[in-house]
Amino acid sequence: MGWTAVLLLCCTLPAQGLIRIPLQRFSSVRTELRSAELLESFLRDHQPDVFARKYSQCFPPRLHTLRLGWTSEKLYNYMDAQYYGEIGLGTPQQNFTVVFDTGSADLWIPSSYCVSEACTRHRKFKAFKSSTYTQVGKVISIQYGTGHMLGIMAKDVLKVGDLVVTDQEFGESVYEPGFTFVLGQFDGILGLGYPSLAEEVDSPVFDTLMAQKKVTQPIFSFYLSRKKSSANPEGELLLGGVDEALYTGPIHWVPVTQKNFWQIKIDSIKVQGTSTFCTTGCQAIVDTGTSLIGGPTGDIILLQQLIGASPTSMGEFVVDCVRVTSLPQITFTLNGVKYPLPPESYVRKEVISGQEICFSGFQAMEMSSRQGPLWILGDVFISEFYTVFDRGQDRVGFAPARQTGEWGS
């Protein structure tokens, strides 16, 4: 049976037999920097390109590359990542917390030989304890701001959920710079982008799962809850299918326009029903590795004005928490289907020094694609819509996500 036939069948099958990876929601690095009173200095040193740095491989506004005679790669920016899950590497298994990131395609974790401050605060892979470990012999350099990460490539047994694959290539970092990894509550990154996005691994993790026939269908899906509940998952990555209990209505599909990031076309973006942005269409990357929605600077500044957001000294935008429920709805139209974002989705509430502050979930970035202006649809969008990534038919699907309190309805 071909992938197409299997995919048609999968949309009507229950979720039994599929592989679930629970995702936990933690404070982002941005929040940790703010709590440590370090955010202002970090943004001063790294703005305006904290967003651009992640996507510079395919959409370079400027080049951030360090070459040391070995393979060179850009280090992705994860200061807004919030949802993490567990994987296991080696024999016997060593566990790590990772960002499952559709905006990258490589897998890396800290090495036991790493002595950077960031590594001392995270679990480190002990290669000498794994009987199935193989060193590839390639040194990697990953650029980040004014510093760089160094590492080596290796292969070992990888466990994701209940799935086990052999000879998965991954990077072991031996030097990690910057506050992003010191304060991050994740050990490493597991990329779920297309193979063309990977600069280091020959076969990204999901490609290995498909090649070794570990998933019945070439799809994976994300559920990210906006609300914490002891009875229901904060988030879930499902490998090989979808879980109908986590969304309502049908899944609507949007074709991938460029196979590296999960890039799709936006028809339009409207604020309270008025067509304001992308009136002639634009492009978007669906990215589980950031919590924000990013867009062109001019559009984002206008959007902040339309929702009544005011700038802070650190380049962020805040709204009056009392007014959140009266803020306008923002609607993204994708492949003819409207996806409305209520203010409860695009406003992030944080308590700082005992005071509740409401931050806008939109952030400016300066990049474009050959097909038009570029937006980033991060967790602000994905938490509102159950999101399915289909490698078999190169498309992304969306359906309204069930929120806490809607279960069993």
PLM feature spans:
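Extended, H/D-rich, highly charged conserved domains that either
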Residues: 194, 214-240
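Aspartic protease catalytic domain
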Residues: 2-36, 40-45, 92, 100, ...
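Flexible, small-/acidic-enriched active-site or ligand-binding loops
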Residues: 232-281
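Aspartyl protease active-site motif detector
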Residues: 83-128, 158, 189-193, 239, ...
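Aspartic protease
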Residues: 112-164, 302-339, 343
